[in-house]
Amino acid sequence: TLSESVNMRPILMKGHERPLTFLKYNREGDLLFSCAKDHTPTVWFADNGERLGTYKGHNGAVWCCDLSRDCRRLITGSADQSAKLWDVQTGAELFTFKFDSPARAVNFAVGDKLAVITTDPFMELTSAIHVKTISSDPHERAYLF
């Protein structure tokens, strides 16, 4: 049977100080990205659970994340009414998209030239879908066109 042939061992990953909100593997499956209410997205080695790094800059719970196809950029959505674009390798914040309500979901489009971000209803505002153009040059600061 399958359960007899697969030898699974649990890996305990310690690092977040508040509850987790989202998990995402990269395409190769060797990295795991986690989001939590502690404001700090984190990247882990998937095979041993070792923390590789964190992405510091949000001031609220981080609800979600997505990776570019080449795994060079990470986008995160937060309760701090922003979505942030990061350099995966260095952890550098590349750009911040600001909104009038919390960013609840983020996703890169095929080709990584567009990102879609949804925002929650907030006070008198309704929920919204925002499509943002992403620069192909990671050093270019003008991510919005």
Give the location of each predicted region:
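Short C-terminal beta-strands that terminate individual repeats in beta-propeller domains
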Residues: 2, 9-15, 35, 51-57, ...
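Solenoidal tandem-repeat scaffolds enriched in leucines and small polar residues
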Residues: 105-145
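WD40-repeat beta-propellers
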Residues: 41-46, 65, 83-87, 106, ...
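Intrinsically disordered, low-complexity acidic/Ser/Thr/Pro-rich linker and tail segments
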Residues: 1-22, 30-31, 42, 120
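Conserved strand-to-loop turn within each blade of WD40 beta-propeller repeats
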Residues: 28, 35-38, 45, 77-80, ...
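Structural hallmark of WD40 beta-propellers
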Residues: 30-33, 42, 51-53, 71-75, ...
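Loop/turn segments within WD40 beta-propeller blades
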Residues: 24-29, 66-71, 107-113
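WD40/WD-repeat beta-propeller blade-loop signature
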Residues: 9, 16-19, 28, 51, ...
